[in-house]
Design a protein with these regions (language model features):
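Positively charged n-region of N-terminal signal peptides that target proteins for export
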Residues: 1-4
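Bacterial N-terminal signal peptides
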Residues: 7-15
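Short, functionally important structural connectors and interaction interfaces within domains
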Residues: 9-10, 66, 110
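Sterically constrained small-residue positions within well-ordered secondary structures
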Residues: 11, 49-51, 89, 106, ...
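Surface-exposed, glycine-biased beta-strand/turn segments
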Residues: 18-94, 131, 140, 174-271
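A broad detector of the eukaryotic-type serine/threonine protein kinase catalytic domain
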Residues: 65, 120-123, 134
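Zn2+-dependent peptidoglycan hydrolase active-site motif and core
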Residues: 69-71, 77-122, 147-152
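Conserved, short, structured surface segments that act as functional micro-motifs
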Residues: 94-100, 127-190
């Protein structure tokens, strides 16, 4: 029963993609970097890493823990084009997605970087950014979490905010740290290329597909909170997530680091 439901939801998703391929120009990425701590004035740590079929990005926290990093700058990981900059609410809060083009093995490839739970958005959709551009500030997802940055790098540029319609593994996502470590310095940064745009579902298709999936869950999946061992939990697509903290994370909050380190240069990660 579940497969036909997913197929129909996928059809709804596909049907709401703009049929004509639109493009915009952007500078090739000359390298990718960590999105926090660029000025070296504060230390950060990775509180939660990428886990296929689980946590689909990385959570970066200030070394002081708690909300000590609230309002700290968030920087664009590479040259790119802002394709999403809105308050998505739910478990996300303010979100920015930037589309990047880079040269690898003679081919032009595309990825999206996502910056979630922002306190402030400082860029607009359609804006072209350079690596290190301040695009927002670290937030709490409207008070849902201790302040931190949720950071993703996606190889599938159709996802947008509709993650439930795509594989939750390496077919869709990169491990952000591994991706950046392998691409800190790239050639072609002065070259301008075209990138696909408007690859996400439009708002109507978004709502229709999500409404269908919500109303037709099979196998006991739920989209309203239930109690499990005294905790409010949600079930979506066979996965459990906390109704109190939102669908991005498990119900565990980021922990204090065992040690902290400067992250303005990614070489620091290699020696630790």
């Amino acid at each position: 029963m579940r497969r036909p439901l997913l197929c129909l939801a996928a059809w709804l998703y596909t049907a709401c993609i703009l049929p004509a391929q639109e493009t915009a120009s952007v500078r090739l990425a000359d390298g990718f970097g960590i999105p926090v701590g660029l000025d070296g004035s504060k230390k950060y740590y990775k509180a939660r890493g990428f886990r296929p079929n689980g946590h689909l990005g990385e959570d970066w926290n200030g070394a002081g823990g708690g909300d000590t990093d609230l309002g700290d700058p968030v920087y664009c990981t590479a040259n790119g084009l802002v394709v999403y900059a809105r308050d998505y609410r739910a478990g996300w809060g303010n979100v920015v997605i930037v589309r990047h083009a880079f040269s690898e093995k003679g081919d032009i490839r595309y990825v999206d970087s996502l910056y979630g739970h922002l306190d402030r958005i400082l860029v607009k959709e359609g804006q072209r950014l350079e690596r290190g551009h301040k695009l927002g500030t670290i937030g709490t997802g409207h008070g849902r979490y201790p302040a931190h940055l949720h950071f993703e790098i996606r190889k599938d540029i159709r996802v947008g905010m509709f993650r439930s319609m795509f594989p939750r593994d390496f077919r869709t996502y990169f491990d952000p740290t591994q991706f950046i470590l392998a691409r800190q310095s790239l050639g072609g940064g002065e070259r301008t290329v075209s990138v696909p745009i408007n690859t996400f579902p439009n708002e109507q298709g978004f709502a229709e597909a999500e409404k269908y999936a919500t109303e037709n869950r099979a196998g006991g999946d739920r989209t309203s909170p239930v109690r499990t061992n005294g905790k409010r939990m949600m079930f979506e697509g066979g996965m459990r997530w906390s109704a109190d903290t939102g669908q991005v994370h498990s119900d565990s909050a980021p922990s204090k680091p065992k040690r902290s380190f400067q992250v303005d240069r990614y070489e620091d990660l290699r020696s630790r």
